[in-house]
Regions:
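Contiguous, well-folded functional domains in the mature portion of proteins
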Residues: 1-147
Length: 147
């Protein structure tokens, strides 16, 4: 099982947080059937835009200590069988990069990081392309850098 706790991508102050309740095991009708050869086992990953809009989500706005970042938003997206998103930080709390923000309760998941316009973010894919064969990036390893 993958790690289902959320860690802050930046140091800063929690400005606002809330849960958006959504679907459970929602899929689009054509999901997984784009391939002319057979159903696609990667379909849940390929349809993350849909899942991000319909699934249960936890939203945390953080005013980063780094002025190059400013206000940013972390969105935890519960995929497939996630039963809930638990936010453990509080509004007004100062957090450090790597501190736990919350946790998914049972099941699959993904995350979204939103930055304001003009923030130059360079992602580190650790020498791999996103696919079913890619490996998890270790907790606290760099996933992106603000330039």
């Amino acid at each position: 099982m993958s790690y289902h706790r959320w860690n802050s991508p930046v140091s800063g102050t929690v400005v606002k947080d809330y849960n958006l309740y959504g679907s459970y095991y929602s899929e689009t009708l054509p999901q997984g059937f784009e391939s002319p050869n057979s159903p696609d086992p990667a379909a849940p990953n390929d349809f993350q835009a849909y899942i991000t809009e319909t699934a249960s989500r936890a939203v945390i706005f953080i005013k980063a200590d780094n002025p190059k970042i400013g206000l940013m938003c972390f969105v935890a997206v519960g995929m497939a069988e996630v039963l809930g998103n638990e936010i453990i930080v509080k509004v007004g709390q100062h957090i450090n990069k790597g501190d736990q923000l919350g946790i998914f309760h049972f099941g699959g998941s993904t995350h979204v990081l939103l930055f304001r316009s003009g923030v130059n973010v360079k992602f580190n894919l650790h020498g791999q392309e996103p696919s079913l064969g890619s490996h998890n990036i270790k907790v606290h390893d760099e996933i992106a850098r603000v330039e």
